[in-house]
Amino acid sequence: MAPKRGSSPAIAGHCSLILSRGLPSVRVTDSNRQKKLIRHLHTFLLYLPADTSCGYRPECGAASFRTRQSSLMVSSEMPNTSTLRLCTVCASNNNRSMESHRVLKEAGYDVSSYGTGSAVRLPGLSIDKPNVYPFGTPYNDIYNDLLAQSAERYKSNGLLEMLDRNRRIKKAPEKWHDSQKVFDFVFTCEERCFDSVCEDLMNRGGQLNKIVHVINLDIRDDNENAKIGGRAMLELVKALNSKMQECDQQGVPFEDTIMDVVADWQQAHPQLPLLYSPAYY
């Protein structure tokens, strides 16, 4: 069922929609009842400003946002005291996830990065012959291999600069499915990576009963858009971290408020469609 547009809950609290895995869409008019449903039914609360439309993906329990206008208020800079464990994910753990890794690391966050592809694939000297490497191949080795193939070609398309950045951050690209680390937030950079992460977490069985928030930002796979996406991801992380600290101080469950944060962020970044799904370790 396609949700109808309404007014922002900041203006009219009656226009809220609850979307739940395996449950029909439910409209709720009372804010206290909203919170109870979120806590007890493990639902996803989505606020719909008048200029926002949304979609729900029952196959992965994800809420998606599409916004046409921007009105996010940027908070003043504060020292980073976050203890969040973050993760960025793209297909090959080379461009988008590594640029976001760099940005978040330089901002002082505890961050790791991974790829979900079957192998690391980078453009080759011809379109039909990409360079393919196993995950775990050191960035320095990949750099030297491309340098030997054609320094001029790979310098002009930015691959050598990208790999030089990567080898300064960590040793080699890592595969998501081989990682046993536990994160608070996982940020993927395209929908197929989001689906892969959600499916893998579901297959792990959730034995730790530890919630993880999986968020996808649809970032185009080129140098410039990777930088744009990295900056936007940092802005989202700052907003989420600030809200978590606020919730801790007020004794409010963060899960009740996360959709406010992502909806505000999406208004400011309509060019980066967002998908969200909670999952469990």
From Swiss-Prot:
GO CC annotation, single: chromatin
Main subcellular localisation: nucleus
Recorded catalytic activity of this chain's protein: O-phospho-L-seryl-[protein] + H2O = L-seryl-[protein] + phosphate; O-phospho-L-threonyl-[protein] + H2O = L-threonyl-[protein] + phosphate
GO MF, one annotated term: protein tyrosine phosphatase activity
Biological process, per Gene Ontology: intracellular phosphate ion homeostasis; mRNA 3'-end processing; positive regulation of telomere maintenance via semi-conservative replication; regulation of pericentric heterochromatin formation; regulation of siRNA-independent facultative heterochromatin formation; sno(s)RNA transcription; termination of RNA polymerase II transcription; termination of RNA polymerase II transcription, exosome-dependent
Record-listed E.C. numbers: 3.1.3.16
Pfam families: Ssu72
tRNA-binding keyword on record: no
Keywords attached to this entry: Hydrolase, mRNA processing, Nucleus, Protein phosphatase
Enzymatic class: hydrolase
UniProt keyword annotation of Nucleus present: yes
Cellular compartment(s): Nucleus
Signal peptide as annotated in the record: none
Origin: domain of life: Eukaryota
InterPro entries assigned: RNA_pol_II_suA
Free-text function comment from the UniProt entry: Component of the cleavage and polyadenylation factor (CPF) complex, which plays a key role in polyadenylation-dependent pre-mRNA 3'-end formation and cooperates with cleavage factors including the CFIA complex and NAB4/CFIB. SSU72 is required for 3'-end formation of snoRNAs.
Subunit and partners: Component of the cleavage and polyadenylation factor (CPF) complex.
Family note: Belongs to the SSU72 phosphatase family.
Name the record gives this protein: RNA polymerase II subunit A C-terminal domain phosphatase SSU72
Organism in which the protein naturally occurs: Eremothecium gossypii (strain ATCC 10895 / CBS 109.51 / FGSC 9923 / NRRL Y-1056)
